[in-house]
């Protein structure tokens, strides 16, 4: 029979394990030279080998013949009873077999110890990496001095060089020693995470190391993206390395300059967040509209970041380039660019932003834990900026204005701003009138509001248009709502004097319904506008308003 036939396994057994189990010494001796190595080392389903069976049946010579042909694993295999060939031989008293197995074990242990010694004898490169990881700069520097370029340029199993380790651990002096001794290829090495020594140096804020590395880097590695989609420019901006950013920008591709990382940040957002005004000004002309208007994962735009950092010029440069959505953007804490601009007293920015912003965005209130509930108007009241206050009032909700007036002690400048604002809504004035302490102040605001409507009315009448009457009645409705709503709400005796004052004001003020009629008379007499221009229905409406206000004299004037 040939080797292939003899080496077959049947039900987990070979002919050799059968012969050994049955104690057939001569059969075993004849089989061993003809069996394959795999068959000799075969382990049956009970964990026994031909060697363990030979030991059980006392075939010492067969054991001695098998041992040199078997693997260490098969010799030391433990069967289902927990026995090895050596333990069986000891139980059986097979001295020669025990000595042989013990010698093999001792030899194996010596080999293990020798290998351990070899593996524990560390190379200079391994020692250097250990020193860097331990941040032992003195030890690392001492090792570098005695190492050649080939040793220093090795890449370890984690795809790191000594230089990337030193840069990642922020060891500036170690990096300074390494750079002159390393090849350009290793300096430009990109690890499995997309990092280079330069990206690590930028991440660690090592300005001098970045300066030393950049001239040695290829265009490709300078524009390399990390696994977080960061460029070295974004990383340098994050660490406020303005000088490095200045050096990098001319070397970066358009794609790299407009790159968005996994946090949604661009180099521009990073630079603005780090107060790098010059870098922002250098980046903006090079960036696409899409990148300039990009919103990061936290809801911030470059404009919000610039306003937050107090970069007035950057904001002024950005605003004309921002979309309506980006200008009105509120971040995840509901802070807008306007809130930050007002908070940082960026008056010019506020003046440009406010007309461009929606009512909702202007009245957005912050959920930031440091200024929870603050709106742009809240910051105005804290900063005491009357001019910005005047700009905000027409777009600020009455509720916000009333709440601020109730809470703040310094009300005077707010009242003055309201008084000087021609666009204060009737609702705001009505609500402010309800604040007892502010009623006298608001008389001025009422006068202001009426005077503005008078001017508008005169302009309308000058147009000599029959539709003017309709516009006039709309104006009267606004006026009527302003006072009538207040008078119906406040009916206590305490408010009687003020009520009388307001009624007198109504009678004497130029822009009452009666005042409108008086204004019409000279124009009728001069044929500039004729009473026939007004329909009977419109005249009836005017008369109704006048009668409701009990102004009989003026009604008679109209006929």
Swiss-Prot record:
Protein name, per record: Putative ankyrin repeat protein RBE_0902
Any single Pfam family the record assigns to this protein: Ank_2
InterPro entries referenced in this protein's UniProt entry, alphabetically: Ankyrin_rpt, Ankyrin_rpt-contain_sf
Organism of this sequence: Rickettsia bellii (strain RML369-C)
UniProt keywords, alphabetically: ANK repeat, Repeat
ANK repeat start-end pairs: 11-40, 46-75, 81-110, 158-189, 228-257, 263-292, 298-327, 333-364, 372-402, 524-554
PANTHER family, sorted: ANKYRIN REPEAT AND PROTEIN KINASE DOMAIN-CONTAINING PROTEIN, ANKYRIN REPEAT-CONTAINING PROTEIN-RELATED
């Amino acid at each position: 029979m040939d080797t292939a036939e003899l080496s077959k396994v049947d039900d987990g057994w070979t002919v050799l394990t059968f012969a050994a189990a049955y104690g057939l010494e001569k059969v075993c001796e004849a089989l061993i030279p003809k069996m394959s190595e795999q068959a000799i080392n075969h382990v049956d389903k009970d964990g026994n080998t031909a060697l363990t069976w030979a030991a059980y049946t006392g075939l010492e010579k067969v054991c001695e013949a098998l041992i040199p042909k078997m693997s260490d694993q098969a010799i030391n295999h433990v069967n289902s009873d927990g026995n090895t060939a050596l333990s069986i031989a000891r139980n059986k008293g097979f001295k020669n077999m025990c000595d042989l197995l013990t010698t093999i074990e001792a030899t194996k242990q010596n080999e293990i110890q020798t290998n351990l010694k070899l593996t524990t004898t560390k190379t200079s490169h391994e020692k250097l990496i250990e020193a860097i990881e331990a941040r032992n700069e003195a030890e690392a520097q001492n090792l570098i001095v005695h190492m050649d370029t080939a040793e220093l340029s090795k890449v370890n199993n984690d795809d790191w060089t000594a230089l990337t380790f030193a840069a990642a651990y922020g060891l500036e002096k170690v990096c300074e020693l390494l750079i002159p001794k390393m090849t350009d290829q290793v300096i430009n090495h990109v690890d499995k995470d997309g990092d280079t020594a330069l990206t690590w140096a930028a991440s660690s804020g090592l300005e001098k190391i970045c300066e030393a590395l950049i001239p040695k880097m290829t265009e490709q590695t300078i524009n390399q993206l990390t696994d977080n989609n960061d460029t070295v420019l974004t990383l340098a901006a994050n660490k406020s390395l303005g000088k490095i950013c200045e050096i990098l920008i001319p070397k970066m591709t358009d794609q790299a300059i407009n790159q968005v990382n996994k946090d949604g940040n661009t180099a521009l957002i990073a630079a603005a967040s780090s107060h790098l005004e010059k870098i922002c000004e250098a980046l903006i002309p090079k960036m696409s509209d899409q990148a300039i208007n990009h919103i990061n994962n936290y809801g911030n735009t470059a404009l919000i970041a610039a306003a937050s950092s107090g970069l007035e010029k950057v904001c002024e440069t950005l605003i004309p380039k921002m979309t309506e959505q980006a200008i009105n953007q509120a971040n995840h804490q509901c802070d807008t660019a306007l809130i930050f601009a007002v908070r940082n007293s960026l008056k010019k920015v506020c003046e440009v932003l406010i007309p461009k912003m929606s009512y909702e965005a202007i009245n957005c209130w912050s959920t930031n834990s440091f200024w929870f509930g603050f709106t742009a108007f809240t910051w105005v009241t804290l900063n005491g900026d009357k001019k910005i206050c005047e700009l905000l009032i027409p777009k600020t909700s009455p509720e916000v204005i009333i709440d601020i007036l109730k809470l703040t002690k310094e009300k005077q400048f707010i009242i003055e701003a309201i008084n000087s604002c021609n666009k204060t809504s009737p609702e705001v004035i009505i609500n402010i009138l309800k604040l007892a302490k502010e009623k006298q102040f608001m008389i001025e605001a009422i006068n202001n509001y009426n005077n503005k409507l008078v001017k508008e009315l005169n302009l309308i009448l000058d147009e000599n248009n029959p539709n003017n009457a309709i516009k006039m009645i709309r104006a009267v409705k606004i006026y009527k709502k302003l006072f009538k709503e207040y008078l119906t709400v406040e009916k206590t005796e305490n408010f009687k004097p003020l009520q009388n004052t307001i009624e007198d004001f109504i009678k004497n003020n130029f822009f009452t319904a009666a005042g409108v009629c008086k204004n019409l008379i000279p124009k009728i007499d001069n044929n500039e506008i004729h009473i026939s221009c007004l329909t009977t229905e419109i005249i009836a409406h005017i008369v109704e308003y006048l009668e409701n206000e009990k102004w009989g004299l003026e009604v008679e004037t109209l006929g």
